[in-house]
Amino acid sequence: MWCVAELDDAYIAQMEDVLALYEKPYKAAEPVVCLDEKPIVLHADLRPPRPAQPGHLAKRDNEYKRCGTANIFAIVEPKAGRHFTCATPDRSALQFAQVIRDLVTAYPFARTIHLVMDNLNIHCRKSLTDHLGEREANYLWSRLQVQYTPKRQLAQSSRD
């Protein structure tokens, strides 16, 4: 099928690297954190919701006013049960750089922060350098051991 990705040797090797990182025992000095982001639509109620009353559930109208969009960055440290979220106006290299700064600040005693994230174009050292300067970017990036998740390539096949 044209929409099924091929799992080639490079994909499998990168996947195994991520899984091996997840299998390591917890070490506070080397936290394993995962980062991702999601665009969201902001809504406002057209009518005020009705609060719950004895014997009646709260009610909220299904109509809403669209109030633009935003972005949510989520950072999860699964083995410690910690998570951080950050709402930003958009998903940009500047926002990513600021989230990485906040991440490193949140782990002042970590020797190395293992960061698992996808291959989005802003998920790179250049985003930090462009917006925070070479010196701060070098410091922040040196605190990270980045592990990118594997990227699937679509299978090349003909459609009949």
Give short role names for the model-derived ranges:
Residues M1-M15:
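Short Lys/Arg-enriched helix C-cap and helix-to-coil transition segments
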Residues M15-Q98:
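Extended, low-complexity cationic-aromatic segments
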Residues A29-E30, A80, A110-T112, L140-Q145:
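Short glycine-/polar-rich loops that comprise or flank the Walker A/P-loop
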Residues V41-H43, I122-R125, A155-Q156:
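Short catalytic/ligand-binding loop motif for oxyanion handling, primarily in non-cytosolic enzymes
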Residues A70, D118-N119, V146-D160:
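RNase H-like two-metal-ion nuclease catalytic core shared by retroviral integrases
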Residues L94-H114:
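Short, basic/hydrophobic alpha-helical segments
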Residues R111-C124, T149:
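Acidic/histidine-rich, metal-coordinating catalytic segments
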Residues K126-A137:
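Short, aromatic/basic amphipathic alpha-helical patches
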